[in-house]
């Protein structure tokens, strides 16, 4: 993330201020300078607040950021533009406040924009979602931003001294190590699921084992006493258990089969005895009923005599009935003959009337034939009448269009000839344009090289002048420095260390006398007077301090000048003067103008030729289209003429309407004549068919009448013969016998029933006598008791066998399930063993007690420390090295940092360093962290860093080393900003962002020393 522009309104001491960071060239190191309280740190607060809604230091609340001099009606807001991964973003955050005159607070606002095609497009417009968008975009939260981008007062060393858990949060974000923690959680859940499945399988095995039936058998009970956790023993006992269960089942089955056989024997005996008893009873009953039936024999004989007489008179009765039917048929035939004769007379009359109509119709035959001939000849014309009608309508229009198309075609041909004359022999020359473009490009390149060389030479002369001026200043300051050092060397430094011993000497003098032995040197005291001029010593010390201060200031100036010379030398080395053309700039410009004019002329000529060619092609296409239309017109005109000629030749008409009217009239007349003729023919045909039918009917009726008369005569003869055979003299005898016919069916049924029952009794008595012959009837009660006893025993054993068989099969199913569970469990334990081990290792149960994520973070921290030690060695004069504390526990340690002192060859806690040493270590660690993050693909772009204070704790030599380190960051593409009150930094750092305050508001400006 690299700042581009910062705009502050009513923020801290800045009422309305803008800072343009784009003025910082090539990622220069710059100093933010100003008096205490001027608002230097507020610049860092503004950037942090714009991004996260918080200050750069945790102690400052949001309410503390609003200016006390702000207009009560105006909000506090910060607009911050920055670059990230070659994309530009802008954020605008407005703080909440109570507007003057209101009692309710105006809510905060936050907008996030991204530049697309030179314009800002909004991405978020809500405070919470917008802040989350920034966190995801930068890859850090506010606390991590303070440790990576902005190192505020009091927090610069926070990453250095933070514990493992705090470092873990920062490094996790920087190096995207959460995926390793996710892996650990996934493995943990997998192991948990697998263990639950394994435990569940053990429970299923135990449940199945407990449900196995023992049949109250000691052997099986002994086998079931094995614990279910001993799965190998279970596998060993299962075949024994199954074998013993089969033995028990076989024993029960044997008892069951014996009981079934005994029951079947008694069941058969009981059934046979019951059947015999029933047969004896049935035989006795049938004999009694048979005797009663024989008593009806006389009555049945009388019935049979009546039935015989009824049967003998049947033929006579049939002849009498037949006579009546024949007489009825004769009467009907006579009626039919009379009706048919009348119908034939009516049909002959109708035929005579229709013959008259036919003769009248045939008189118009010649006229109808002529009309049919006309219709046949002109039918094809009438069917396509629209075609001929359209030809009459289109012929005049087509003549006019043809003449117009001919005129237009002639005009286009003349235009084409004119265009061809304009083109002549000219052709487009694009190769010449390419050649001229290449020439112009080469000339422009030569001109640019000359201009760049002139600019580079001017810059070089300027830099050489600056360098010479700096060298002269260094020479002058070196000369002054030598004089001061000579002057310093001339001072008598003896007794200078007694300046602060005046009170000590006075105390000794008051405690001794002349002649005493001196407690310091042991000599005899000769005099107690003032032998030392303390005022003179103090004066010399002040003079020496002043000279030393001047020497220190001159050395600082020389160091600054040397740094500036180094910077100038870098710029000089970057200046490149290229080889240029021998021609002057004036000659090249003249050649450039000539070639550009030639290029424009050739382009105009090519454009004209292309336009003419395009016009020629257009005219050619138009001529082709006109010719096609003219050809089409001529073809259509010829077709119309041919159709009109055809119509007039065939129809002899020259008017379509008259032809249509006559044609339709002829068709109507012909159709009417044909329909009437057909109707008459149909009527004659129908009359002829009807007469033929009636004639056939008449012949049929006459033949029937003759047949019926013959039948009647034969039937009378048969009646006389039957009456003679039956000795019947008149019809009264016949009527009496006929009266019996109403009872005939009842009499026949009574006779047949008697004979049927008589026969059935004979058959049944014979059958029962054969079944009971030579058989003894047993005691039914004794058989019944024995039957119930055997049946109960059999049912009991069948139930027992069914239960044992079911339990045996159930035992087999359960033991098979147990074996299946055990096999699956063994395979599952084998398959999951590696996952269990891996889960324990990544969870920290290993020889280093490290989780997978911390192991990865330790790797990155080691790289960061190694990179930091490269600078720390320089800054500490090869005394200190940062090392990672090796002590770890429970996977959450291993990220603490200690310092190794090469002078004592021992490591010690980081808190034992002095303030300056802590600053050196923190700076080296911060720079190492940023460089390792840049090398890795953690998704965070650390393109800038801002440091607030810390340099005041450094001595002169360490300060020089730290500044050189920060200056060298320019080559890594990092922007570095520093807040410090150290005066030497103003001389060492060329670019300064100066913050001035007038006790009311502050302002900023960039300046160069």
From Swiss-Prot:
The keyword Isomerase does not apply. Belongs to the SMC family. SbcC subfamily. This is Nuclease SbcCD subunit C. Transmembrane segments: none annotated. GO terms for biological process: DNA recombination; DNA replication; double-strand break repair. SbcCD cleaves DNA hairpin structures. These structures can inhibit DNA replication and are intermediates in certain DNA recombination reactions. The complex acts as a 3'->5' double strand exonuclease that can open hairpins. It also has a 5' single-strand endonuclease activity. ATP binds at residues 34-41. It comes from Staphylococcus aureus (strain MW2). It comes from the Bacteria.
